[in-house]
Amino acid sequence: MFEKVVYIKGWCTLFFSLLLLVSCGGGAESASVSCSGDTLAMRHSTLLQLVDCDSFVVAEIKNPWRKGLLQRYLLVPSACDVPAGMPQGTLLRTPLKNTLLFSGIHANMFKQFGAAAAVKGVCDARYIIQPWLQAMLSSGNVVDCGSSLDVNVERVVQLSPDAIFAFPFENGGYGKIDKLKYPVVECAEYMESSPLGAAEWMRFYGRLLGCGAVADSLYSVVCENFEQLRSAVAGCSVRPTLMCELKSSSAWYVPAAGSTMGQMYQMAGADYLFAENKGQGSVPLSYETVLARAANAGYWLLKYNSSVDKSRKTLLEEFKGYAHFAPFKNGNIYACNTARKPLFEETAFRPDWLLAELVTIFHPALSGQKELRYYERMP
């Protein structure tokens, strides 16, 4: 599980005619395209560029791992003819109406746009928490296409999606999907360097669904909420100390300072005790290192995935060393069971919701939120 994906309401009307989808090439390695249009100003994203060329939109994704482009998409309304002289790229006729999603993260975003009907297939259905999507799976309105690591090709072919939304990885392909004719929307937002940068990808996805204005408006709300919370916390003179996560086998993995959660903890007004670990992933530490640093921490936040909720008693049964930390002794542990709490599905594109949750824990008088949605105080 990567930390960048932590690692999510508006409505729009999908009014275009029958979707036509044509492929015009794969990944793009050339420099950014120049067309007679307006480049949309990105507020926080460093990997995404959108250019409105009047009759179509060019979306370019920078390669997060090396110089050049990861992909270029050409978004042309299905009600219009394909313009002549467009640059090389993957042609997508918008709005997309028949999509296969590898993650529930994007399904929740579709729903916020009012475009849930565009979700026709998903992978890893057993991990999806959202009741509305589980109901659509049960009714057969959404197809379970198997594991994202071992896709059911027959079901994908039967679905014949307009596009497949999947996460790219360095030097990695999409397995069986690579052999099919369907275009892949490479969802590289998790490689952004900030929570608001990742959330800004909703502006790209909104344009794929014919909801560009809705997405722009929603993103403005996200940024406004986020900045208001961050500003309110910035003036706090007291910043409670924070430890996080659990020991896993021989290592205790904690978010690095530059990871999504590492940034969020600090922006929420906590004195994150592992902030000296730079980088953007998770850092493996020994139990002894964590104990030396965090024995007297004020708060302990952790996430886990289990069919049964954990308690301090069950933690102690797993590892007796937990008893040596102050939050264990005084009950100041806040836990999120991601098997039943949609933290990952909802907050990837709504970092303002996650920030509000954390501020409610550390500085409840400042958040304006009375109840916690994702975390619970561990009994």
Model-derived features: positions:
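Extracytoplasmic substrate-binding proteins
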Residues: L92, N141, N152-E154, Q158-A251, ...
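A local structural motif
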Residues: A135-D144, A268-G281, P327
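Bacterial N-terminal signal peptides that target proteins for export
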Residues: F2-C12
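Bacterial N-terminal signal peptides
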Residues: W11-S23
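A short, structured surface patch at a secondary-structure boundary
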Residues: W65-V157, I164-F169
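Bacterial Sec-exported substrate-binding components of ABC uptake systems
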Residues: C24-A107, V214-M243, K329, P342, ...
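A short, gly/pro- and small-residue-rich
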Residues: A118-V119, D178-E189, R312-I333
